[in-house]
Amino acid sequence: MGTPGEGLGRCSHALIRGVPESLASGEGAGAGLPALDLAKAQREHGVLGGKLRQRLGLQLLELPPEESLPLGPLLGDTAVIQGDTALITRPWSPARRPEVDGVRKALQDLGLRIVEMGDENATLDGTDVLFTGREFFVGLSKWTNHRGAEIVADTFRDFAVSTVPVSGSSHLRGLCGMGGPRTVVAGSSEAAQKAVRAMAALTDHPYASLTLPDDAASDCLFLRPGLPGATPFLLHRGGGDLPNSQEALQKLSDVTLVPVSCSELEKAGAGLSSLCLVLSTRPHC
């Protein structure tokens, strides 16, 4: 059976989608925010891809940018992946629903079992779903409703699935994430701390917790691309983005920290974990 939580972060491949010029036009989630520097956003995205491929050693697949999908780079919202199963989501925004088509095909080509939501009353953004290695938490937010959470539970029946209220316009993974198989990291805002308290009340598993000054710093990815026993990585927002959280992140001593920047992409609503999908095609991962 192995150690509980040992499957967290196992990965061999990463999927990203290029940044289209339309992302800077204000048509997406960044409308009303400061103007987005397209070239800088594309550089950030390129560096992220480079870190996934070169630093972490993942097989990187990049879908081409599509001008009709300004928020296409936020493909973390389009699927929930665990083991060999990919649940294709139904994003809250109707304009974003065509984003799932290219992701579905890419995941099919990698041999994953595809599950469709198939309920027009359900909404689900992938970044509202947090997998701890032992269980799932699904944020009930502006973006994700009860029916969406029920479909997560129906799809991943081997795991407990609990719902966590998320206030405002945040996604759950914009408030908290996994710093390791037994460690939840969370921002210091009331919304983030409320989410962590709700998770603690719902779980049967003991998790350590680490509070970070910035909510956005908790949107990180714990990844284990190597062989069992190899030191895992934590892909996280670096000091150029969130300097106040770097000292706290150093307390995660059992991981190799890999900093990246997405401060420009953030203007379009991107959190770090929304910018890629990671998966394993290896057996027993």
Curated annotation (Swiss-Prot):
Changes after translation: Phosphorylated by TBK1. Phosphorylation inhibits the translocation into the mitochondrion upon Sendai viral infection.
GO molecular function: hydrolase activity
Record note on disruption phenotype: Mutant tissues do not show any changes in dimethylarginine dimethylaminohydrolase activity compared to the wild-type littermates.
Active site residues according to the UniProt entry: 171, 276
InterPro entries, per database record: DDAH-like (IPR033199)
Expression by tissue: Expressed at high levels in kidney and lung (at protein level). Expressed in islets of Langerhans.
EC number(s) on file: 3.-.-.-
Any one GO cellular component localisation term in the record: mitochondrion
Keyword annotations from UniProtKB, A to Z: Cytoplasm, Hydrolase, Mitochondrion
Protein's cellular compartments: Cytoplasm; Mitochondrion
Record has Signal as a keyword: no
Membrane-spanning intervals of the chain: none
Major location (coarse): cytoplasm
Membership in a protein family: Belongs to the DDAH family.
Function: Putative hydrolase with unknown substrate. Does not hydrolyze N(G),N(G)-dimethyl-L-arginine (ADMA) which acts as an inhibitor of NOS. In endothelial cells, induces expression of vascular endothelial growth factor (VEGF) via phosphorylation of the transcription factor SP1 by PKA in a process that is independent of NO and NO synthase. Similarly, enhances pancreatic insulin secretion through SP1-mediated transcriptional up-regulation of secretagogin/SCGN, an insulin vesicle docking protein.
Protein name: Putative hydrolase DDAH2
Gene source species: Mus musculus (Mouse)
Source species taxonomy: Eukaryota, Metazoa, Chordata, Craniata, Vertebrata
